[in-house]
Amino acid sequence: MKTVGYAIVGTGYFGAELGRIMKEQEGARIVAVLDPENGQTIAEELDCDVETDLDTLYSREDVEAVIVATPNYLHKEPVIKAAEHGVNVFCEKPIALSYQDCDEMVRTCQEHGVIFMAGHVMNFFHGVRYAKKLINDGVIGKVLYCHSARNGWEEQQPTISWKKIREKSGGHLYHHIHELDCVQFLMGGMPEEVTMTGGNVAHQGEAFGDEDDMLFVNMQFSDNRYAVLEWGSAFHWPEHYVLIQGTKGAIKIDMCDCGGTLKVDGREEHFLVHESQEEDDDRTRIYHGTEMDGAIMYGKPGKKPPMWLHSIMKNEMKYLNGILHGKEVDDEFRPLLTGEAARAAIATADACTKSRFEDRKVKLSEIIGEGSTI
């Protein structure tokens, strides 16, 4: 098996762990990192070089692919430059903070013939894949409605993270875009229209950032189907789940009291959300035992992700490495590698943002163009 050389741009909480995981994969080697704050420390740990310039990094003959895990607002340049140098790309979510930037990133990768994989990690949850199979098999009938919630309470922090600044993170809607992507995956595509309401109701003043701490999204899909999504850090009763209602039954993927449930004909079947009961129990323990509610908890450089998160990140990196070694793309993951999932998530998020600030229902065609498809 050939060895694929990977670079990492952004070696904070997520980037460093993705590097550790990729280093363990067969036929994979981390050859260089670029991060002005954390790069040297992680390079020593991963036994690789440190670079300080993107063009120099991507010009290296041993760099075949890059993992981009910079802060959200800094994704575009390293992705575009990688494509221009013929380097394959894995980019963490949210891919961009605007549909225009996301579309440019995807198109540039397509034009230069490089792989572009979106880091929508919920696609690698055992429970999400199982729920999709149940839907495809018609077990719960036609899906009529999805409801997701990802909320909790956040106290004042010692410093204001970039993740709390809307211009840099996009706020809960973009930074926690996993549930939006998951709902669209389960519903089979984007909604036709959206409405978003919300605001900053409990975290105002100089000690806090400027993101909205309560957001409520209503989505209307074709064929008379609907979804409601909630996010925020102003909820003292924390919840984190995706609920799917069909004409014959329902499925709940609960990430707070971690476990999945299928309900059909008055009977319940339980299934794992992650790869093992130990991982599900680990997530439940963390969600109920941290100072900040687990659904809205943020990682920091120097910390390592919990067991359940490490496991799905490992699945994600193993899949990426397999693709770069010639493995065929599975149909269920194809949108992650065609730009479809990346564009669809950001298009819907942009429509929601437009609705919030223009106080009206917004059609997705206003974002992607009339008659356009993702």
From Swiss-Prot:
Pfam families reported for this sequence: GFO_IDH_MocA (PF01408), GFO_IDH_MocA_C (PF02894)
Regulation: Neu5Ac is produced in the presence of NAD(+) or NADH, but not in the presence of FAD.
Cofactor notes: Binds 1 NAD(+) per subunit.
Binding site for NAD(+): Y13, F14, D35, N38, T70, N72, H75, E92, K93, W162, K163
Official protein name in the record: 2,7-anhydro-N-acetylneuraminate hydratase
Tree of life domain: Bacteria
Top EC class of this enzyme: lyase
Family assignment from sequence similarity: Belongs to the Gfo/Idh/MocA family.
Cofactor field: NAD(+)
Annotated catalysed reactions: N-acetyl-2,7-anhydro-alpha-neuraminate + H2O = N-acetyl-alpha-neuraminate
Signal sequence residues: none
GO molecular function, one term: lyase activity
Induction: Induced in the presence of 2,7-anhydro-Neu5Ac or alpha2-3-sialyllactose (3'SL).
Summary of the knockout phenotype: Deletion of the nan cluster abolishes the ability to grow on sialylated substrates. The fitness of the nan mutant is significantly impaired, with a reduced ability to colonize the mucus layer in monocolonized mice.
Outcome of substituting K93A: Loss of activity. Loses the ability to bind NAD(+)
Free-text function comment from the UniProt entry: Hydratase involved in the degradation of sialic acids, which are present in the host mucus layer and represent a much-coveted source of nutrients for R.gnavus, a prevalent member of the normal gut microbiota. Catalyzes the reversible conversion of the dehydrated form of N-acetylneuraminate (Neu5Ac), 2,7-anhydro-N-acetylneuraminate (2,7-AN), to Neu5Ac, allowing growth on 2,7-AN produced by the IT-sialidase NanH. Acts through a multistep mechanism involving a keto intermediate and cycling of NADH/NAD(+).
SUPFAM superfamilies: Glyceraldehyde-3-phosphate dehydrogenase-like, C-terminal domain, NAD(P)-binding Rossmann-fold domains
EC number: 4.2.1.-
Assembly, per entry: Homodimer.
Keywords in alphabetical order: Lyase, NAD
